[in-house]
C-alpha cells in the first residue's frame, strides 16, 4: 500500500491543487486543498484546520472523495472513510516536512491541524481515451 500511496501523493502534488468532497446536512460540499503526505506509517494523510467547517462535516459524515486533474487531461479520484489522527508523532512528522503548516498551526497561533487518512481507500486513475486503472 505504501508504494501506491506514494504514487497517489505524487499525482496529487503534480496537480498542485485537488478537490475534496464531503457532505453537509445531505448536500455535497467541495473545496480546493493542497496538503497531502505519506508518512512513515505508510498512510496517505490529508488535513485541514480543526476550526474549519469542512473538518466538522467530515467528522459527522466521514465518507469523502478527492479528485485531481493534470494538465495532460488525466484525473485521479480517491475515496474512502476519513479517520482523524491525534497522534503527536503524526503531527510532528507533518510539521517537520511542511514549514507553512508548522508556522500556521504553532502553539502561539491557537489553531490546530486535523490530519486524517482514508480507511477502505479506493483510487481510480482515468485518461481522456476512456481508460481507467484501479490504483487501490
Residue spans of the language-model regions?
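Hydrophobic residues embedded in beta-strands of well-ordered beta-sheets
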Residues: 28, 42-44, 123, 132
Amino acid at each position: 500500500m505504501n508504494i501506491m500511496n506514494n504514487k497517489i501523493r505524487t499525482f496529487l502534488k503534480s496537480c498542485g491543487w485537488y478537490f475534496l468532497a464531503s457532505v453537509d446536512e445531505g448536500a455535497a460540499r467541495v473545496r480546493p486543498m493542497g496538503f497531502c503526505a505519506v508518512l512513515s506509517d505508510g498512510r496517505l494523510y490529508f488535513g485541514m484546520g480543526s476550526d474549519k467547517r469542512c473538518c466538522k462535516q467530515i467528522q459527522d459524515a466521514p465518507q469523502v472523495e478527492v479528485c485531481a486533474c493534470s494538465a495532460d487531461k488525466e484525473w485521479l479520484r480517491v475515496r474512502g472513510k476519513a479517520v482523524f489522527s491525534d497522534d503527536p508523532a503524526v503531527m510532528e512528522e507533518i510539521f517537520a516536512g511542511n514549514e507553512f503548516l508548522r508556522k500556521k498551526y504553532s502553539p502561539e497561533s491557537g489553531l490546530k491541524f486535523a490530519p486524517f487518512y482514508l480507511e477502505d481507500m479506493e483510487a481510480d486513475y482515468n485518461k481522456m481515451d476512456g481508460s481507467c486503472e484501479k490504483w487501490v
